[in-house]
Amino acid sequence: MSRYRGPRLKIIRRLRNLPGLTNKLVESKKNQASGSDQSIQKKVSQYCIRLEAKQRLRFNYGLTERQLLNYVRIARCAKGSTGQILLQLLEMRLDNILFRLGVVPTIPSARQLINHRHILVNDRIVDVPSFHCKPKDIITIGAPKIYQSIITKRIESFAKDQIPDHLTLSLSEPKKPKGFVNYLINRESIGLKINELLVVEYYSRKA
């Protein structure tokens, strides 16, 4: 299954707000339903609940079905909580790190910067959005002038307290902002509100 490239509002109306996909906020269809409509709604099956959690995770991080399944398989082979390790793997992707640093408004826009070879990790160009960042990595945003003003305005409008503790943003060189990965992200710093156990349960027979 390919990566979704359709209307983003359509997705967040169905799956609720996904900060990585779009910074627009809408009221979900579930919340828009009237009291009489809610009373006649059918009971949602456990499968549908797990499916929705999986879809929220997939669309928020901009993954294909195969990519997410591969991450689940990797998480299963690692020591520790499969759900938490899965979230760590997704959060430590380069495209998501740029998003969490506040350099770009969404993960798709971070992916564009990476694909255009404007991002360096430890002084080496990285053009793979799924690149796995590690503690002590230094990420440099070497965007051309056409992007610099946009990135600067974005950073200025982004509250510093929104940057999670495992990351640090340095503006000592305004034209080349740098991000530092301090340590692996913990569960409390995950930006997406989700029950990761539902995703693990969804893939229990596939991974």
Curated annotation (Swiss-Prot):
It is found in: Plastid, Chloroplast. GO terms for cellular component: chloroplast; small ribosomal subunit. InterPro entries: Ribosomal_uS4 (IPR022801), Ribosomal_uS4_bac-type (IPR005709), Ribosomal_uS4_CS (IPR018079), Ribosomal_uS4_N (IPR001912), S4_RNA-bd (IPR002942), S4_RNA-bd_sf (IPR036986). GO terms for biological process: ribosomal small subunit biogenesis; translation. Pfam families: Ribosomal_S4 (PF00163), S4 (PF01479). It comes from the Eukaryota. NCBIfam families: PRK05327.1 (NF003717), rpsD_bact (TIGR01017). Part of the 30S ribosomal subunit. Contacts protein S5. The interaction surface between S4 and S5 is involved in control of translational fidelity. Belongs to the universal ribosomal protein uS4 family. One of the primary rRNA binding proteins, it binds directly to 16S rRNA where it nucleates assembly of the body of the 30S subunit. With S5 and S12 plays an important role in translational accuracy. PANTHER family: 30S 40S RIBOSOMAL PROTEIN (PTHR11831), SMALL RIBOSOMAL SUBUNIT PROTEIN US4M (PTHR11831:SF4). This is Small ribosomal subunit protein uS4c. It comes from Equisetum bogotense.
